[in-house]
Amino acid sequence: MKLNTNLTVAIHTILCIAFFEKDNKVTSDFIAGSTGMNPVIIRRILGKLQAAGIVETKAGVGGSSLSKKTDEITLLDIYKAVSEEEDGDRSVFNFHSNPNPKCPVGSKIHLVLEEPLSAAQKSLEEELNKTTVSDLMEKL
């Protein structure tokens, strides 16, 4: 995953659904009003969250609801849902693909960076797994 806003917008989306779903139809337009994002982007994120089994969406203006309880959804679940690339990679850190193999730096850059970046990715995922949507709802 490239460093972008998908994760934070997805978390915002889920918090909106959890906060408002009892009293409102939480549509992509509704969520867009809270996030300040285009409804098309919200629908894309909702599609990924639905594919991951985190939310349910109803066609048209039916709105969205959570598929699980808020204490069963971690930030890692959300991260996995929205950050995975088409090739299955969800790493925050991606290598540039064509370093110069004849250069003493370029020929070893992947090897040199693999361990520390893998450790950082693991730490990120461990931290995200410690926080649930319920934890965040308590702070709203």
Where are these regions (language model features)?
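Short amphipathic alpha-helical interface segments
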Residues: 13-22
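Short coil turns linking two alpha-helices in DNA-binding domains
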Residues: 38-41
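Basic amphipathic alpha-helical segments that dock to polyanions
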Residues: 46-50
